[in-house]
Amino acid sequence: MKRSLFILSLVIAAAKFLPAANSLEDVLNQQYKNHTYTLRQSMTAPTQQYDSLGNSPTASALGPWTIYARVQIKKIKLEPARVIVEGQRVGMKFDPNQGVLAETKLKETVKLKISLNEPLESADQFHTILGHIFAFSKEDFLASLPEFWRSCVKGYLKSYSNDGSTMRFDVSEATLKVRQGTSEKAAAGLESSDGHRVTAPQPKKISDPSYTKAAKSQDLEGTVVLALTVDETGKTADIRLVRPLGLGLDESAAETVKTWLFRPATKDGQSVKIEMSVEVDFRQYK
């Protein structure tokens, strides 16, 4: 009998000294597991270091947000001086059936190691820390985007939940034009506001864009629509995204178009700067 009481006492004593972090870890996993959030910095590294204010002492190269920004949390592990968040990358690609950007799971995983300057004691404290690393608000999400993307997303982002776990896009005007076969192209002859005839720029040096690994793995095909300026020398500038394709192909299209050369537009025989839109097609030939 005394032996049984002694063993029971040991069990109770051991239970008293179990670290409180274990129960908090369970709470955090229940709260965040399988939820998807947008990183403020779309770093490409599979393992990333952060402090509790979201600063990264070992910041890696940045990549397209449609490949590297969205992360679905799979596991949270608490340690005495840090939190480890394991996740799966979630891409954004154009869905031709809906005519919008939509989520698609990628094979790549990512691990976030967050150092703590004080013990983690509550779920609210952890949420505050995550808010420095992920864009929980629509404003923070838009601010995290490259300028190239911002006006496009701002115009067609339908909804962004309070914590950023869900986002929805509207069908853009550019998408409707592509569907209807009426997308803007440089016309053979244009008329300026003062009635003078303007000849459109003509392609002189055009190269094809490259596919991203993520886009290839998803068999993504389609058309990126860009707005740009062709200056008096035939060079492109002020490239802006009008209709995206996702999975890094938009950045690939823009980088390629930067190298294009045109015979410049002319007005009364003189070279002039002109704004136009171009379509960049992505097709996989097997």
Regions found by a protein language model. Give the residues of each.
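Acidic, low-complexity proline/glycine/alanine-rich linker and hinge segments
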Residues: 170-217, 255-257, 286
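Bacterial N-terminal signal peptides
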Residues: 5-16
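Extracytoplasmic
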Residues: 32-34, 43-45, 68-73, 78-82, ...
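Mature extracytoplasmic/lumenal regions of exported proteins
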Residues: 80-181
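A short, well-structured alpha-helical segment
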Residues: 219-220, 235-266
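N-terminal secretory signal peptides
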Residues: 21-79, 160-163
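A beta-hairpin/wing motif
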Residues: 173-177, 181, 218-234, 268-286
